[in-house]
Amino acid sequence: MPKVIGLTGGIATGKSTVSELLTAFGFKVVDADIAARKAVAKGTKGLEQVRAAFGDSAITEEGEMDRKYVGEIVFNHPEKRLELNDIVHPIVREIMEEEKQSYLNQGYDVIMDIPLLFENELQNTVDEVWLVYTSESIQIERLMERNQLSLEDAKARVYSQISIDKKSRMADHVIDNLGDKLELKQNLEQLLTDKGFINKER
């Protein structure tokens, strides 16, 4: 019986790397971020709803959502963030559910890659939750380097989510990413072996 695993983490914990590794191990990944982009892609009903809620300035000359413009609005106006979520989330759920069912019907184990899994209380939609863990100090350091952010901005982004330590206590399994990529791969392989997804002797 194929399994549905919820994969989550925090900003800059290395979840995308784990997602890529799991694909290499034969899992099918359904990515919430990709689904969110599809939900408001050019020519979609979702994009028209964004235009109605945020005005013509929310759409670029190319007919796509102006992410920077909308991002600044929702960052500064919590009620607008809720409005955007009300537009995007139902469409995202529909897209992800369709992809998940398609893979399950083909007999694949499915990874639901959902950054805000706990924040949106989606743990009951999967068989178990795997969390990619690193320390908050490493999160902040990686974020500053990756996104060219100041210390204050990096901290603000990290602290806008449930803390990674609290999430680790809520998850079924924690994938340690305190070291380098090779150590991360070894930690993931160990989990997959323990869970019976792969046979190391093979």
Swiss-Prot record:
Pathway: Cofactor biosynthesis; coenzyme A biosynthesis; CoA from (R)-pantothenate: step 5/5. The keyword Transferase applies. GO terms for cellular component: cytoplasm. It catalyses: 3'-dephospho-CoA + ATP = ADP + CoA + H(+). InterPro entries: Depp_CoAkinase, P-loop_NTPase. Pfam families: CoaE (PF01121). It is found in: Cytoplasm. GO terms for molecular function: ATP binding; dephospho-CoA kinase activity. The keyword ATP-binding applies. Residues 4-202 form the DPCK domain. Its EC number is 2.7.1.24. Catalyzes the phosphorylation of the 3'-hydroxyl group of dephosphocoenzyme A to form coenzyme A. HAMAP family: Dephospho_CoA_kinase. This is Dephospho-CoA kinase.
